[in-house]
Amino acid sequence: MTTASRDARLRIYFVGVGGQGTLTATNLLARAALDCGIEAVGGEVHGMAQRGGVVESALLLGGWRSPRVDRGEADILLGFEPLETLRGLPYLRQGGAVFSSSDPLAPLSVALGQAVYPGIERIRAQVAEVAAKAWFLPCRSLGREAGSVQSAGTVLLGAACASGLLPLTFDDLAAAIRKHLPAKIQAVNLAAAELGRAAVA
């Protein structure tokens, strides 16, 4: 599969729920880019990192001055939970790409019966109205298969890096996992990334 040019300028928007490793994934992808000589600017947009809160972050590759991503500007949206993918959709430009978990993690309002969780098919349909390409992966299930549900975010990164849409290859991501993650969780995350790659093959 071809890979975007190392000189590509991309705006990536991440959205998830606290406890899912959204910020860890953002930082890992940023480090992978920097290791390859790609300029990377990132930042937390909105953080309620305690378990269950909404977490949003941005990563801009290729020489941007500010980590800010406004509505309709993101080239790629990484959603770590389907409903959060839907909430982050306004930030995606028309014709952009989405990588999303298809495994719901119902928010407290749904758990308490105060709100209804939309079906995954409805979420897919709304994403299809904006995104030219979209992948929905059972990230929590694949993370569990890799050895830890906490590696679900790495499943998404593996899929994104294997898609050819980023200026990073899958091998670049694997190298960053080996270099930047603690030794005790490297094998699990490498396995998770591989499952993500296989899901978009």
Annotate the PLM regions.
Residues T2-A201:
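Active-site cofactor/cluster-binding pocket
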